[in-house]
């Protein structure tokens, strides 16, 4: 529904940022690592978003770039990992470490993320190894590779 929100970063908490745009202040939930990436209060910011809607609540989740949003959405595809858990995982591991651990099946690294035990790490690897849809993947030749999601269509 919302791809991104640009505006003035008007505040930060431990798990969210506030972005003021055209007289509306948006509360956007972000990972702890994204808090530092998004800049300082009072500055212009662009936050890529994903809207979570249930019958009893709506939450807007934010990311400093589209690649992190894509990784977040991949994590939410894992059984037992909802949006809040995915954000916690991304607070404990940066996106490159997380992607590497998933691709290599590194359970020990995944368990360093908050709330991830051995079973959850195994589920994450089983569900996502070789299937990450990150838009910014680059092949060893320096060319952008085709997203795994669409690779079957191309070949």
Please identify what each model-predicted range represents:
Residues 111-114, 124:
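Glycine- and Gly-Pro-enriched alpha-helical subdomains that act as flexible
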Residues 124-155:
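Strongly charged, low-complexity linkers/loops
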């Amino acid at each position: 529904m919302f791809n991104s929100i640009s505006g003035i970063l008007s505040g930060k908490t431990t798990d969210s940022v506030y972005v003021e745009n055209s007289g509306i202040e948006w509360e956007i939930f972000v990972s702890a690592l994204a808090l530092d990436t998004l800049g300082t209060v009072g500055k212009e910011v662009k936050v890529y978003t994903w809207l979570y809607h249930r019958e009893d609540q709506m939450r807007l989740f934010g990311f400093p770039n589209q690649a992190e949003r894509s990784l977040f959405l991949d994590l939410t595809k894992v059984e037992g990992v909802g949006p809040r858990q995915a954000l916690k995982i991304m607070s404990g591991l940066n996106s490159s470490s997380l992607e590497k651990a998933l691709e290599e099946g590194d359970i020990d690294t995944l368990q360093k993320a908050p709330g991830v035990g051995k079973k959850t790490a195994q589920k994450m690897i089983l569900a996502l190894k070789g299937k990450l849809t990150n838009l910014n993947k680059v092949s060893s030749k320096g060319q952008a590779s085709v997203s795994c999601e669409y690779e079957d269509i191309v070949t």
